[in-house]
């Protein structure tokens, strides 16, 4: 399927305990009543507003997309700007507070044409945070049981039942008890505990007391909380949901006071937008709104099992809500998630020609393993990416043969069978590849972040720690679908500082501030299961997207790219170099050797530099045999060389860079010939069958076609039937509409290993068989 949105461990001691039911009055003093006796708001941003407008109305203006953005960032504060074609929350805070007089905004385009007028919501209607709990009784919640019975759970057997996701064990005990009290300890512990749901639970309570060295996670409704050693947690079921004692305090948290707000539609958010804001007789204009590219993220997912079955733990791929949540953390206008069917490889061919059928003889690990690198990363992930670029074949080893012109990532779960057993791989990202173990949480945000060009601990404390409102690198997130702010601190009051490199950020009202995804951060709550990037990182991410092209069926070239000067998306020509070429050794520049190379390669290059130089370069006479051949000289050595060509001798000095093309009679000198060719998809965003594998142009290593991979969304290119000779290396694919022939490189890109191939064909064409051919010889055939 594809989803689019426009938007350390030790063995615990085993202990036995008795459980009993106490039919005696409960001491009221054990429980605390949390009432709504303090309704005063807690404001995050209490700084004095700074005027952003021109005119009689003075007001500070901010916008919120994936996070709150200042109209005019403070000096030295690296913040992202608005993303085109993404809806935005407009936040207006008058310098002179007035919460009563209505505020309107009039939007105009770069031609001063009115786009529309909106009346802003008053400060009393400012959206809540994701920590705000709905359904709380006006009088608050009294955490006192309705009657005097309780059940104590303190045996290993009973505690083990608590990991049931339905919460059935706790539910059964609550039927005849007002309170269930659960004691965890070393040897009597589970990682996850679930509270039950049901109308018969009204007024019931659950209390957790932990003396376990390991933390547990308590799940209640759509929320969760960590239970740590020494902690006590108290819950009560009210109005159809569980509430935890102490969490209602978060209902008081709000971004700032005196803020008027309205949602601006996505089609208004384009360069040239200006706003006229009116309050009573006052009016102010915001002209210089910086709006950047409508960036797009294309994310492929695939679950791979190498000599073992796939793990079936790619949670992100299965969860559309996870797609939506991650989209809310990045500055793009569109994100497409393309899920591939799981891939079970019962045998694995390596580029060396070694076929693995049982296990990889080497060891593997989270960050290691031959199959992890060669198959999961290079062949499958880059294979998916490169097939969408129309790049049919590349070097068999390494990650360098990847153009990365589009923000296109292939994320994979993979595990393999090695000499040290079945090993799960994860924890790496970059260059269009994401290798993941856990796909919900910071590992995902972190490894995808590497693909955006983010390193670890970007800019140290000043760039990697979320800050309070008066500091640089401060913001809140925004969920534009749920209409909720996401504070940059955790919901629990722990009074912890956030420190990095001997610098610390004090907590906000006891709440610890977060860290960036690239600096050991974590999601703030279950409301969004991904880590909020700091403004500093978000600005870098935005620059990444603004420097990438997008697939675009409406473009004459099949791609579009943001032009920062014109502030428009313009046609972008994606080119690849498929010319057969070689760089001649400086020790083999005789006429006969050069003639031999020219007979085999369309382009022969001579590149010299200090330490890699020879005096004479001999070129064969132009003839019908070498008509169309290209010779390119790049001379960077300090010593001169002599080029013998066209019956003449030519001095070649440092800095000389030219090409010669044979017309059959003469070598004609010209500027360096660009042999790259433009690639434009033939079909856009269609279900694809992706074919990958290895082939050896020399025919000495065993070529191999892997099982087909099936994706829901990809790009296909016309085949090369019109430009192929029978001797050319090619992949032939039989379909219901006939045979397709795709050109592959005729020479090894790496001297000692095979080349990779990676090609998309439309699934609709019903491909049935693939055949690898070189020099008119069949290398391998695969039924699809």
Language model regions located:
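Propeptide-to-catalytic entry region of secreted or membrane-anchored zinc metalloproteases
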Residues: 45-151, 241, 247-440, 452, ...
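Active-site His/Glu-centered metal-binding helix of metallohydrolases
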Residues: 444, 448-452
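Short edge beta-strand/loop segments characteristic of extracellular beta-sandwich folds
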Residues: 89-95, 207, 716-721
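Short proline/glycine-enriched turn/loop motifs at strand-loop junctions of beta-rich domains
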Residues: 95-101, 210-214, 635-639, 724-727
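Exposed extracellular interaction/assembly regions and N-terminal maturation sites
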Residues: 143-218, 243, 580-644, 662-669
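Tight coil/turn sites that cap or link beta-strands
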Residues: 228-232, 653-657
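Gram-negative bacterial Sec-dependent N-terminal signal peptides
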Residues: 2-34
């Amino acid at each position: 399927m594809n989803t689019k949105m426009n938007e350390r461990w030790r063995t615990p001691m085993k202990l036995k305990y008795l459980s009993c039911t106490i039919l005696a009055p409960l001491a009221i003093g054990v429980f605390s009543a949390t009432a709504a006796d303090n309704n005063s708001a807690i404001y995050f941003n209490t700084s004095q507003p700074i005027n952003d407008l021109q005119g009689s109305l003075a007001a500070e203006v901010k916008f919120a997309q994936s996070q709150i953005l200042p109209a005019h960032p403070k000096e030295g504060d690296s913040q992202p700007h608005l993303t085109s074609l993404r809806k935005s929350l407009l936040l207006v805070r008058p310098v002179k507070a007035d919460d009563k007089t209505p505020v309107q905004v009039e939007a105009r385009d770069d031609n001063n044409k009115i786009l529309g007028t909106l009346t802003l919501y008053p400060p009393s209607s400012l959206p809540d945070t994701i920590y705000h709990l709905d359904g709380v009784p006006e009088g608050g919640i009294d955490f006192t049981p309705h009657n005097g019975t309780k059940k104590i759970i303190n045996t290993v057997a009973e505690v083990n039942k608590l990991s049931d996701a339905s919460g059935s064990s706790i539910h059964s005990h609550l039927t005849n008890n007002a309170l269930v009290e659960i004691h965890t300890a070393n040897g009597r512990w589970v990682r996850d505990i679930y509270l039950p749901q049901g109308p018969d639970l009204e007024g019931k309570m659950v209390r957790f007391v932990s003396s376990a060295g390991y933390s547990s996670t308590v799940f209640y409704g759509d929320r969760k909380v960590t239970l740590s050693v020494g902690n006590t947690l108290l819950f009560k079921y009210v109005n159809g949901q569980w509430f935890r004692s102490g969490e209602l305090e978060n209902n008081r948290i709000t971004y700032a006071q005196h803020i008027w707000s309205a949602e601006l539609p996505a089609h208004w958010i384009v360069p040239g937008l200006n706003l006229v804001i009116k309050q009573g007789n006052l009016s102010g204009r915001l002209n210089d709104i910086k709006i950047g590219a409508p960036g797009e993220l294309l994310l492929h997912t695939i679950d791979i099992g190498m000599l073992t079955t796939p793990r079936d733990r790619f949670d992100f791929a299965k969860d559309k809500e996870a797609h939506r949540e991650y989209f809310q953390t990045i500055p793009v206008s569109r994100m497409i998630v393309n899920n591939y069917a799981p891939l079970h490889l019962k045998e694995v061919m390596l580029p060396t020609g070694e076929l693995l059928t049982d296990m990889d003889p080497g060891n593997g690990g989270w960050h290691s393993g031959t199959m992890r690198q060669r198959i999961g990363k290079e062949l499958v992930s880059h294979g998916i990416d490169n097939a969408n670029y129309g790049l049919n074949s590349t070097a068999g080893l390494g990650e360098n043969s990847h153009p990365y012109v589009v923000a296109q990532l292939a994320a994979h779960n993979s595990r393999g069978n090695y000499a040290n057993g079945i090993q799960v791989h994860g924890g790496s990202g970059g260059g269009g590849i994401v290798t993941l173990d856990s796909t919900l949480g910071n590992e995902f945000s972190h490894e995808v972040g590497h693909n955006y060009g983010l390193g670890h601990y970007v800019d140290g404390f000043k760039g990697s720690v979320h800050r309070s409102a008066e500091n640089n690198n401060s913001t809140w997130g925004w969920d534009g679908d749920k209409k909720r702010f996401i504070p940059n601190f955790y919901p629990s009051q722990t009074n912890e500082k956030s420190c990095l490199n001997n610098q610390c950020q004090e907590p906000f009202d006891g709440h610890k501030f977060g860290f960036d995804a690239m600096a050991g951060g974590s999601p703030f709550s279950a409301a969004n299961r991904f880590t909020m990037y700091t403004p500093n990182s978000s600005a870098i991410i935005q620059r990444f997207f603004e420097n990438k092209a997008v697939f675009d069926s409406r473009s004459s070239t099949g791609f579009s790219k943001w032009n920062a000067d014109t502030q428009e998306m313009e046609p972008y020509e994606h080119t690849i170099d498929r010319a057969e070429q070689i760089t001649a050794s400086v020790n083999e520049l005789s006429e006969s050797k050069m003639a031999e190379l020219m007979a085999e390669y369309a382009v022969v290059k001579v590149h010299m530099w200090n330490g890699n130089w020879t005096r004479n370069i001999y070129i064969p006479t132009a003839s019908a045999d070498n008509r169309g051949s290209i010779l390119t000289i790049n001379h960077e050595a300090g010593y001169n060389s002599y080029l013998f060509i066209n019956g003449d001798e030519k001095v070649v000095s440092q800095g000389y860079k030219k090409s010669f093309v044979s017309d059959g009679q003469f070598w004609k000198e010209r500027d360096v010939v660009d042999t790259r060719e433009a690639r434009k998809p033939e079909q856009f965003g269609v279900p694809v069958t992706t074919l990958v594998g290895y082939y050896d142009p020399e025919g000495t290593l065993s070529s191999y076609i892997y099982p087909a991979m099936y994706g829901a969304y990809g790009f296909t290119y016309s085949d090369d039937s019109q430009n192929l000779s029978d001797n050319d290396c090619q992949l032939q694919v039989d379909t219901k509409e006939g045979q397709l022939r795709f050109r592959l490189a005729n020479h090894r890109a790496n001297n000692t290993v095979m080349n990779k191939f990676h090609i998309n064909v439309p699934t609709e064409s019903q491909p049935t068989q693939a055949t690898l051919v070189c020099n008119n010889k069949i290398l391998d055939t695969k039924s699809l």
